[in-house]
Design a protein with these regions (language model features):
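Binuclear metal-dependent hydrolase catalytic cores
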Residues: 1-131
């Protein structure tokens, strides 16, 4: 098993826009962190944990490979704001979303166009698994 940390920053990322603290103004690359996300890989599957608004930037440098599912820890924007960027990965097939029911309800409200019966072309195929 391999765990790849895609981001370990706060909900606003680091550096935070407008912040003048020593970390946010540091030139050290270790002080430049995208929002929290990870990919867990085994021989059989690749599971994304959280898909925040930095997702596109987090995966641009990685090999373009199938994502077998996404585990969403909670419904805050910094953990779900990048779900629409899963569109290219749907070329491999549906990318199921795994989440608690309260998170699934929030996703249906936030992104209803993804979870209706008749989606328009190009909408990511990200069914809510088990719901």
């Amino acid at each position: 098993m391999k765990v790849r940390i895609l981001g370990s920053g706060t909900s606003t990322g680091v550096p935070q826009i407008g912040c003048t603290c020593p970390v946010c103004t540091s030139a050290d690359p270790k002080d430049n962190r995208l929002r929290a996300s990870a990919i867990v890989e085994t021989e059989d599957a690749r599971i994304l944990i959280d898909c925040g608004p930095d997702f596109r930037a987090q995966v641009l440098h990685l090999p373009f490979e199938k994502i077998d599912g996404v585990l969403i820890t909670h419904e805050h924007y910094d953990h779900v704001g990048g779900l629409d960027d899963l569109r290219p990965f749907c070329r491999f097939g549906a990318v199921p979303i795994y989440a608690e029911e309260y998170v699934a309800r929030a996703l249906r409200l936030r992104m209803p166009y993804c979870f209706v019966d008749h989606r328009y072309p190009g909408v990511p195929d990200i069914p809510l698994a088990g719901n």
